[in-house]
């Protein structure tokens, strides 16, 4: 059973977060291992396995990038374990420039202002790519969606680096 079906949701990129959370809580209550403490060992083990599946499914569907990766896996794309080489040199050059810019921000006297502006631009890039990806999923252009997911992974990693730098600047 796929994760969407587990939560009674349609297989779509856009997910109602509130509905996902409420169904997650209901399934957690239903399959919580403590409810099976007095049951035979086989039932207890099945409950533990089901609880783990529910948790994994929720984590995959809750995060937009993980959800996209999971949806692609349903269509035969394993973007987590592939050795795919990014062929979009313009995108790769842009990533190098963004990383250099982020590295330079920490040395600036107005680092907090510069980082805020950088984070805003990065967020706009992520929103734009997510919009493209949404269209690609809706149109079932899986190869294009996989390419967009690969690009979003670069941006997601850059977003994590922005958050790390924000923490460093707060500690100064």
UniProtKB/Swiss-Prot annotation:
Q: What molecular functions are annotated in GO for this chain?
A: ATPase activator activity; protein-folding chaperone binding
Q: Where is the J domain positioned along the sequence?
A: 2-74
Q: Does the keyword Nucleotide-binding apply?
A: no
InterPro entries registered for this protein in UniProt: DnaJ_domain, HscB, HscB_C_sf, HscB_oligo_C, J_dom_sf
A GO cellular-component term linked to this record? iron-sulfur cluster transfer complex
Tell me where the signal peptide lies.
none
Which HAMAP family does the entry mention? HscB
Q: What does this protein do?
A: Co-chaperone involved in the maturation of iron-sulfur cluster-containing proteins. Seems to help targeting proteins to be folded toward HscA.
Mind telling me which NCBIfam families this protein's record contains?
Answer: hscB, PRK05014.1
The protein in question is named Co-chaperone protein HscB
Taxonomic path? Bacteria, Pseudomonadati, Pseudomonadota, Gammaproteobacteria, Enterobacterales
Name of encoding gene: hscB
